[in-house]
Amino acid sequence: MLTGKLVTFEGPDGAGKTSALNAIVAKLQPQLGDRLVVTREPGGNQISEAIRKIILDRHNTAMDDRTEALLYAAARRQHIVQTIQPALQNDQLVLCDRYIDSSVAYQGAGRGIGEQAVYDMNQFATAGLTADLTLYFDVDAAVGLNRIQQHRQNEINRLDVEALSFHHRVQAAYLRLLADHPDRIKRVDASQPLDQVVTQALEIMASQLPTYVASKGGEDQ
């Protein structure tokens, strides 16, 4: 029985979701201790991290779009079996940097494979394991890419170098997901300074998951 909770962090490149995640972890760790599990996709264990290197390697320019989508799904399956599911069975709070919505947005819309096709593929890969809460860090695609150029030159990967039109398609898909799943996906204004982004995200988490996240991000604990 899965008694824990899965919170996923989503957003276009340069939205700052990973920085926000790290700041949130710093606030929640004293409160939750071992009940908090932090992971990422693709990755989260040895096999999935190996797949991550293949996917994001800038030299793998010959990779077919469907191959890319299948690799993400394969990494996700291993991640669930080896990392996420055991944590949820242990009543832990799992914070995951990207999940299914990323595949729908990036491969389904960005690559043009089809959002429904990618969703269906991932339903098979995940056996229907859905996030309890998704924080969508929203920022304009052009702003996000500019942030990457300014602050992440040494970390630019194969998807970061796609044309702006690709990233606009990704952002549009995220907004459709937000509209289609309002109970699960909550928008965070990622154009704000980081401390305000973190505050807004923690307020959402506290309202949705009070068993794990105290009001004011656990600062009163």
Swiss-Prot record:
Superkingdom of origin organism: Bacteria
Sequence positions that bind ATP: 11-18
Disulfide bridge map: none
Gene3D superfamilies with a match to the protein in the record: P-loop containing nucleotide triphosphate hydrolases
Single GO BP term: dUDP biosynthetic process
Enzyme Commission no: 2.7.4.9
HAMAP family from the UniProt entry: Thymidylate_kinase
NCBIfam families: DTMP_kinase
Homology family: Belongs to the thymidylate kinase family.
Record's protein name: Thymidylate kinase
